[in-house]
Swiss-Prot record:
Residue(s) carrying N-acetylalanine: 2
Phosphothreonine: modified positions: 287, 306-307, 331, 336-337
UniProt main location, coarse: membrane
UniProt KW rRNA processing keyword: no
Signal peptide feature range: none
CDD domains assigned: STKc_CaMKII (cd14086)
Family per similarity comment: Belongs to the protein kinase superfamily. CAMK Ser/Thr protein kinase family. CaMK subfamily.
Pfam families in UniProt: CaMKII_AD, Pkinase
Source organism of the structure: Homo sapiens
Residue ranges of domain Protein kinase in the record: 14-272
Residues noted as binding ATP in the record, renumbered to the chain: 20-28, 43
Protein name: Calcium/calmodulin-dependent protein kinase type II subunit delta
Length: 499
């Protein structure tokens, strides 16, 4: 049974042996539990190199792996924290990658492909039943329990996996491996369990012919193919594949996630559950030959990436491997895992909450405003005559005496927002704020101010803790005195833009 231990040192219970693999800030080594002599694989994470957000991801991975107990999933047996290191103790799987095993076989048929994808679907179905979305299904994460003939396929690496409630669809960030990304992720739409089924469709396609359904050296063109669902079954290699196999692929590679087949439904598909009578038993030598080339290509790219990450500072390596928009270069597009929510999604979150705050101001909704602002909010603004304003009373005055009593339409635009993320729970946004309104004579007016807001996240909610506004104060409502019977808007207080 998996357990979290902090009181017992890993070195007291386990003996370490040779290295099995290496990541950016982790290494996997064979180990033995001293009291029992049982062998495992220990993933050793150097926690000194992790940010607070990386720590959260590590905790999430351990939590998810403890939950999943299935014959087709690599099992987590122990999770141990020490000073500077965290140890995840997994099953020792010795059979290597599924795709490497296939090319070494003397005989490989459509029925064998059906058996492979069935085991993958069993693992995915178990994940989905437990509210887990893997998000990174690909050949590198499909291992064999041993080198014995007929060894079980094991799904590995839950580093990108997320927890969802039921059939929840939400934006969990841009994460996965380019060739296996679903259309909804590429469109930045809310997503959920169906992303795993899309990846299963890509994997099944490769299992049958040895090459992927979507491929282009240019990543932009690759993504366009995926979003359009632009794949086909070309001759002659697909001529010998049964219609039932193609039907299952079509159901998996359905662009609309709501109409995409689920894991439980796929397991009931005739090509899976009636394999002996439906799937072809003909040996597919061309598939094996193509798969050898496919394996060689992804292994070369994987080796290049590993070398770069192992020989450079990790954050520097990440920046070298990424384009300005946070997406990896196309030379790594076939098998490089990417996770981009740390930048784009978090910045968008800050812009969105800033817009919500301004909407509360425009609506004169002080209650909504106070929910978004810290009670000790500080501010510099022209109306405070250079003084630092602290607390909500200064702002309450305008809400109660002007904003809530105004029924004039107001429209605000945020121009050129720039967000700086300061750690995991703080951010700063600078922007130009344009406010359009109708003056007392019915003429349209526009006010401009330059604003900076500092946000802090507490208990999962962003709160505005400070803002600084510059610009000349102007009054969008009728002042108390109108000399010569004319309205004067040259001075006074900006009742919409002072908060």
């Amino acid at each position: 049974m998996a357990s979290t231990t902090t009181c017992t040192r890993f070195t007291d219970e386990y003996q370490l042996f040779e290295e099995l693999g290496k990541g950016a800030f982790s290494v996997v080594r064979r180990c033995m539990k001293i009291p029992t002599g049982q062998e495992y694989a220990a993933k050793i994470i150097n926690t000194k190199k992790l940010s607070a957000r990386d720590h959260q991801k590590l905790e999430r991975e351990a939590r998810i792996c403890r939950l999943l107990k299935h014959p087709n999933i690599v099992r987590l047996h122990d999770s141990i924290s020490e000073e500077g290191f965290h140890y995840l103790v997994f099953d020792l799987v010795t059979g290597g990658e599924l795709f490497e095993d296939i090319v070494a076989r003397e005989y490989y048929s459509e029925a064998d492909a059906s058996h492979c994808i069935q085991q993958i679907l069993e693992s995915v179905n178990h994940c989905h039943l437990n509210g887990i979305v893997h998000r990174d299904l690909k050949p590198e994460n499909l291992l064999l329990a041993s080198k014995s003939k007929g060894a079980a396929v094991k799904l590995a690496d839950f580093g990108l996996a997320i927890e969802v409630q039921g059939d929840q669809q939400a934006w969990f960030g841009f994460a996965g491996t380019p060739g296996y990304l679903s259309p909804e992720v590429l469109r930045k739409d809310p997503y959920g369990k169906p992303v795993d089924m899309w990846a299963c469709g890509v994997i099944l396609y490769i299992l049958l012919v040895g090459y992927p359904p979507f491929w282009d050296e240019d990543q932009h063109r690759l993504y366009q193919q995926i979003k359009a669902g632009a794949y086909d079954f070309p001759s002659p290699e697909w001529d010998t594949v049964t219609p039932e196999a193609k039907d299952l692929i079509n159901k998996m590679l359905t662009i609309n996630p709501a109409k995409r087949i689920t894991a439980s439904e796929a397991l009931k598909h005739p090509w899976i559950c009636q394999r002996s009578t439906v799937a072809s038993m003909m040996h597919r030598q061309e598939t094996v030959d193509c798969l050898k080339k496919f394996n060689a290509r992804r292994k070369l790219k994987g080796a290049i990436l590993t070398t770069m990450l192992a020989t450079r500072n990790f954050s520097a390596a990440k920046s070298l491997l990424k384009k300005p928009d946070g997406v990896k270069e196309s030379t790594e597009s076939s098998n490089t895992t990417i996770e981009d929510e740390d930048v784009k999604a978090r910045k968008q979150e800050i812009i969105k909450v800033t817009e919500q705050l301004i909407e509360a101001i425009n609506n004169g909704d002080f209650e909504a405003y106070t929910k978004i602002c810290d009670p000790g909010l500080t501010a510099f603004e022209p109306e405070a005559l250079g003084n630092l304003v602290e607390g909500m009373d200064f702002h309450r005055f305008y809400f109660e005496n002007a904003l809530s009593k105004s029924n004039k339409p107001i429209h605000t635009i945020i121009l050129n927002p720039h967000v700086h993320l300061v750690g995991d729970d703080a951010a700063c946004i600078a922007y130009i704020r344009l406010t359009q309104y109708m003056d007392g004579s019915g003429m349209p007016k526009t006010m401009q101010s330059e604003e900076t807001r500092v946000w802090h996240r507490r208990d999962g909610k962003w709160q505005n803790v400070h803002f600084h506004r510059s610009g000349s104060p102007t009054v969008p409502i009728k002042p108390p005195c109108i000399p010569n019977g004319k309205e004067n808007f040259s001075g006074g207080t900006s009742l919409w833009q002072n908060i």
